[in-house]
Curated annotation (Swiss-Prot):
Any GO CC annotation of this UniProt entry: plasma membrane
Source organism of the structure: Arabidopsis thaliana (Mouse-ear cress)
Side of membrane Extracellular, spans: 27-407
Chief localization: membrane
Protein name in the entry: Probable receptor-like protein kinase At2g39360
Topology Cytoplasmic: residue spans: 429-815
Domain Protein kinase: 487-761
Amino acid sequence: MINLKLFLELKLCFLITLLCSSHISSVSDTFFINCGSPTNVTVNNRTFVSDNNLVQGFSVGTTDSNSGDESTLFQTARVFSDESSSTYRFPIEEHGWFLIRIYFLPLVSASQDLTTARFSVSAQNFTLIREYKPSTTSVVREYILNVTTDSLLLQFLPRTGSVSFINALEVLRLPETLIPEDAKLIGTQKDLKLSSHAMETVSRVNMGNLSVSRDQDKLWRQWDSDSAYKAHFGTPVMNLKAVNFSAGGITDDIAPVYVYGTATRLNSDLDPNTNANLTWTFKVEPGFDYFVRFHFCNIIVDPFGFERQIRFDIFVNSEKVRTIDMTEVLNGTFGAPFFVDAVMRKAKSREGFLNLSIGLVMDVSSYPVSFINGFEISKLSNDKRSLDAFDAILPDGSSSNKSSNTSVGLIAGLSAALCVALVFGVVVSWWCIRKRRRRNRQMQTVHSRGDDHQIKKNETGESLIFSSSKIGYRYPLALIKEATDDFDESLVIGVGGFGKVYKGVLRDKTEVAVKRGAPQSRQGLAEFKTEVEMLTQFRHRHLVSLIGYCDENSEMIIVYEYMEKGTLKDHLYDLDDKPRLSWRQRLEICVGAARGLHYLHTGSTRAIIHRDVKSANILLDDNFMAKVADFGLSKTGPDLDQTHVSTAVKGSFGYLDPEYLTRQQLTEKSDVYSFGVVMLEVVCGRPVIDPSLPREKVNLIEWAMKLVKKGKLEDIIDPFLVGKVKLEEVKKYCEVTEKCLSQNGIERPAMGDLLWNLEFMLQVQAKDEKAAMVDDKPEASVVGSTMQFSVNGVGDIAGVSMSKVFAQMVREETR
């Protein structure tokens, strides 16, 4: 405890510091400490004063120089060997929120090795860090506390027999408007009182793939680029001149102009009907609540008079926080910054991931534009007044603290029993090791696929393929078995190269499809990982949605949304008792599948090539809306300076691009070729290869294309469609199909061009049906029809005849 003289000296030093700092000359209760150094240093317009007269303890240092950058702060350290001398006391003139920034780097000298230090840090009766084990690299920890006393105590408490240390320290009084008194609890109508909690900064992220350094922020906050956390790809936007703080009623204390003047925008222009999100994934510690702040500033377009509404939803872990409508917020003022605060309660699993998302609002007639400028995530102290994972209270009510405060008497009483247990444990361990080795040899035989795809073990010995993955969708095997009645064979709805697909029902009555990989699966572990990762990267109305996966005990199970009508293949020629598809339905299915593939090809900076497009991988929901499935063979496309990806040939016989088959050169046009084969199946109503037919008809492509070139379209049309579709429409359809099936990829259309042609054909078909309706019932009015068309572009007719389906869609958050 320092005496009154030292206390007054400390106050005097800090008053001098305030006069030396141009940024905060008018702000009281702001302190910068250069710990363990006899001199002051200046970094980013802040003067860090020596703590030689402020605390006891000894110092450790390297070369002490004032280079002006942050590395200067890590050249010395203040070291404490006992609790009595390990406290910094800061006089507080005005109560309120304070930011504490602590710098750590374990220095090594001839007399002291700080890498072995073990200590805890507390402030105002909050545990900030417990049993800290220093990293070998520099670390900056940031905390926010509501100080209601006349002094702020910051203690660095060494473990018995060890030491504690600190390299530099900042204590800043925050503007009153920065932290609210309370914030909304997501998913409830309640608020959480923030003033009774301490906070630790987890992430502070700026959009637009740009970081913001400390010297660009009035409070010297570091804003990381969003590129490291983004699960989807958006378009970066920058417009610093558009930011108008006065219009937003806030100051740049909330966030600097570099945050509000940059944004990441959801790519919705290429496909306005995209049911996609922009999602950022952060690793967090389970067992804590998290305070989240979303920053917004419309620097893109004036919402008034704009043909597209700027209206979108924001989510945290799939739970909706709020709908943002730029025409309502701040009266739609262009360039006016604002923010939205919310609190996410304890993570519902031990995975420890937090997903922040923005997504399109699908219940509006105009195409939405969605964006975000930045966000901040802070961990809130728990009921133990702690911010350390050691004290976490997990969702099931248990504690992460595995230690016990067992009394010495109890330990003595158990010592004899432990000796007996030790002997027994040795025998059991020997038996378990033999059993595990035998099982590992078996698994290596089944999954011998190289170092990149080795099955890992968790602490309980379970095999976990994604043990270090950021994907937070893992389902326990017991839940999967419950949903499928222990993989009852009567629930099998499909069989493929990967394994069997079961229909399942989760506890909340959600129907799901459960794809279980067989041990002898031809696709195997690599394809399983690829499919799970692909399904978590993308969310689109016409791509099947991932619900979860299971890799427990070396299982390879994928759980995705159940598609009531099965596959397109089922409705073309594997009919059984299924109804036949009309020409209109077939066109709608082609359009939907093309949209999904178009999104794969254009929805990110590098295209995703599906590589296994076929009628069996196009699923249909209860309204016959198409969704592309099975991403196990998907491959990232070529870089911008490359034309193709060289890779081993994989796919399904009959659908393979001949250029890819002969040269092993994969491009997006390989998917176009495969889709052309699907288009032939759609119009002909027969499989690609049918050995039961005469030799000249076995191969669908060869047989159909010969007849198309001869103009004998009536010979290839599905008999069910004869007389129900105009030959000129079939002719146009076959012309597009023929281009897709060109031997040379360069002669094939891009998926976007193909989609446009299909949309146009659907438009023509719909107009024909309207005309027929009027002819049959002249008294009927078609003014109220939900089908609207325009030839202005693909986006303008993207909702053709599917408005009812789209209206029923429930938008889900990704990852």
